[in-house]
Amino acid sequence: EIKNVTYFTEIGLTLIVIALFFKVSAAPFHIWTPDVYEGSPTISVLFFATLPKFASLIFLFRFFIEMDISSYSSLLFIFKFVCVLSLLIGAYGAMTQTVIKRLLAFSSINHIGFILLSILSFQFLSQGIFFFYLIIYLVTSFGVFSILLTLRNNLGEIKLITDLTGLKTHNKSKAIALLVLFFSLAGIPPFAGFFAKFFILTASMNEGLIYLSLIAVLSSVIAAFYYLRIIKTMFFNEGEDTLQENSMFYHNVTYILSALFVTFFAFYPDPIIFIINNYFS
């Protein structure tokens, strides 16, 4: 009878975890994400790519720890499997995209893989580091989508990566801000995203998740390619500048603060780590 209770408990926990994976767009439960990102207005994407995901990931983190998911071998395997798929599908899926919001959708799936890796490394990872990665990712995403909200072309919202051609000359401050934000998303030092990934990889290596750590490093290398492709389009591609401004004051404030935040961390990391460790640990 005890075995039956444990069996049904494990089934119930598995269904809850799968529902959460679907909610946060973890692979292979991500199929809806690229189409929704592409088809929705940018302001809507900005919302559901940040705030609901933040709440769902916190719940998933607490659920993993409080329910002691690591003691269930099948559930632990599912977590690792989904982590690997998210890292690889997110990285490889973004490489072939020409629509910028679809690319960002696959990018978000890749970052979910890193967040799942942080959850799997919880024994060697303080809650502060989990929240640090989550906050860095969400702030950076908020900044990127805020810039996209302010840019249009003759047909309306910009859709293709090539629509960003000439941004360097059209609005240098937005081009530089996107450069900083994409460098952070790619995990390129000295920006905040690099330290966030470094802390998680260190914890996962200490946990003994060597193969997951190597896959995460590989996915970061691949991710750097498609972020750099966008940067190349903004700064080096030649073509007609069809960009138009649709700036609101709060959009400009948001992207400037986001870029300053990930840059500030490169030079003064201690205050931010102290705050996160004290308020989220």
Predicted regions and their residues:
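Alpha-helical transmembrane segments of multi-pass membrane proteins predominantly involved
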Residues: E1-S281
